[in-house]
């Protein structure tokens, strides 16, 4: 695996997480996700394992950047050791990034199909739903949250946040 690719994917995940809080982050997120799909498409010669870990790197960059506040809660408020607090944030980020990685495998498995964008969006929404329900019930950092001022804000009251997420992923494809 190329180290530069992993660094690029991690930084891209961090950028997407950082744009979520901007006033028009939903608009900025779509081209950044398009760049991510393009970058992952370049990895077509990777094995499934390498592809999984490449997309896991993106997810870790995304969640570590978005869950920085857990460090403050654990260390400053809870009194946990700084090293243990950092490790806890990285471990939680790695766990929830697994759902992104599994969803991104659909790009590798169906890259030549004309419905790969729909399959990616469907698997992404399924991954987000499972992330919200299984074990942790961790609903934070979903892509629908960025659509408050984004292009799909009007969809949320009628179809919900997962429909917004589906449209974000599909349009960025």
Segments the model singles out, each with a brief description of its role:
Residues 1-173:
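Membrane-embedded alpha-helical bundles of multi-pass enzymes
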């Amino acid at each position: 695996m190329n180290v530069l690719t992993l660094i690029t994917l991690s930084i891209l995940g961090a950028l997407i997480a950082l744009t979520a809080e901007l006033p028009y982050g939903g608009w900025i997120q779509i081209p950044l996700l398009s760049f991510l799909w393009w970058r992952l498409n370049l990895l077509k010669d990777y094995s499934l394992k390498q592809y999984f870990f490449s997309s896991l790197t993106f997810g870790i960059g995304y969640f570590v950047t978005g869950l920085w506040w857990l460090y403050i809660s654990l260390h400053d408020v809870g009194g946990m050791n700084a090293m243990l607090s950092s490790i806890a944030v990285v471990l939680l980020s790695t766990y929830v990034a697994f759902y992104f990685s599994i969803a991104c495998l659909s790009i590798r498995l169906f890259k030549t199909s004309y419905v790969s964008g729909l399959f990616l969006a469907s698997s992404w929404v399924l991954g987000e739903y499972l992330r919200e329900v299984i074990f942790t019930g961790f609903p934070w950092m979903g892509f629908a949250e960025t659509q408050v001022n984004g292009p799909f804000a009007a969809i949320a009251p009628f179809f919900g946040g997962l429909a917004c997420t589906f449209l974000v992923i599909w349009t960025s494809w």
